[in-house]
Each structure stands twice: as structure tokens, then as C-alpha cells.
Swiss-Prot record:
InterPro entries per the UniProt record, alphabetical: Ribosomal_bL27, Ribosomal_bL27_CS
Parts forming coiled coils: none
One Gene Ontology term from the biological process aspect of the record: translation
Entry-linked Pfam families: Ribosomal_L27
Any one Gene Ontology molecular-function term assigned to this protein's record: structural constituent of ribosome
Region feature Disordered, mapped onto this chain: 1-22
Protein name: Large ribosomal subunit protein bL27
Gene transcribed to yield this protein: rpmA
UniProt record similarity statement: Belongs to the bacterial ribosomal protein bL27 family.
Amino acid sequence: MAHKKGVGSTRNGRDSESKRLGCKKYGGENVKAGNIIYRQRGTQIHPGTNVGCGKDYTLFALIDGVVKFERLGRDRKKVSVYPAS
């Protein structure tokens, strides 16, 4: 019998920190200018009306209003912010 534990168990046990990507504000929610709406890697969702896109593809509101997710053609999505009436 071996008197030392197998080396395999000590080589495991690493994992990367989660990046907290995804939707931060949902359709119909009120947002203020500058609020982050969606964090993503690449353009899963494209910026629509009154929505800006950061260098890491983060979508954010340019005006105060209400979030609306829409289709952009057949196979794309976009998010827009419309003024609350």
C-alpha cells in the first residue's frame, strides 16, 4: 500500500471567477441614463434606439425611459429605451 496520497487530488480545485454577464434590466423596466442594461461578450444583442455600446459590448441607456427588447431582422435582437409617457 502506498503511504502517500495520489498527486491527482492536489492538481484539481481551480475555477475561474464568474463574470456576471447577462441581462441587468428586463423589458418594461424603468431605467435612468447610464444604467447598464446588458453585459455580454460580443453582440448577442445589438444596441437600438437610445442605447449605447461600450468597448466590452456592454449595452447602457442613453436617456431615462423604459426598456424594450425587439427583433432586428430575422435572427438578431436589439434593445431600445423609449421615453416613459
